[in-house]
Regions:
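A short, basic/aromatic alpha-helical/loop segment that forms part
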Residues: 1
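Donor-binding and catalytic core of enzymes assembling or modifying cell-surface/extracellular glycoconjugates
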Residues: 4-93
């Protein structure tokens, strides 16, 4: 998972720039995470449980999408929604969403992309202190931060707004 602190910072940055944020989810753990991310933010909305067609309808009206390497990013690409896709242990060359206005941000972690289902990386004491290893794992996702994503997302939003 991309670190929750990064998601929160990105959401706050988007809202500060007058871009409301909608948070979809697919299972109970994702719903709980979305609620934590939206807590206290008036312009961050956790969507209700939606079937795939409902998620597609939400995406079709979006100015842009940010997703980890999941079906959400591929669905956004299929709908021609500008998308930033985040890659940690996976390789965008193998599984990246393709199409116009699709941007892949991949980790530069020394062992990424490892393509492993289970991370074998041994975090340092400093990493253990800095990150919540229950939520911010694998650590390769920590190498792409919210500022980097916003730097690439903002032009897509500006283009969509023009």
């Amino acid at each position: 998972h991309w670190p929750e602190a990064y998601w929160r910072r990105l959401i706050e940055t988007a809202i500060a720039a007058d871009w409301p944020v909608r948070l979809p989810w697919g299972n109970e753990a994702e719903r709980i995470r979305a609620e934590r991310l939206a807590a206290g933010l008036a312009d961050a909305t956790v969507l209700p449980r939606l079937p795939l067609a409902g998620i597609a309808a939400q995406l079709a009206g979006a100015r842009a999408c940010v997703a980890v390497d999941t079906g959400l990013g591929h669905l956004a690409a299929a709908l021609d929604v500008p998308t930033i896709s985040l890659f940690g242990p996976t390789n965008p060359g193998y599984t990246g969403a393709w199409g116009p206005r699709q941007i892949h941000l991949a980790s530069d972690f020394s062992c990424a992309p490892c393509l492993a289902k289970t991370c074998a990386y041994q975090p340092s004491a400093a990493e253990r202190e800095r990150f919540d290893l229950e939520r911010d794992w694998p650590l390769c996702f920590t190498r792409v931060d919210a500022a980097q994503v916003w730097q690439r997302l903002q032009p897509l939003l500006d283009e969509a707004h023009a």
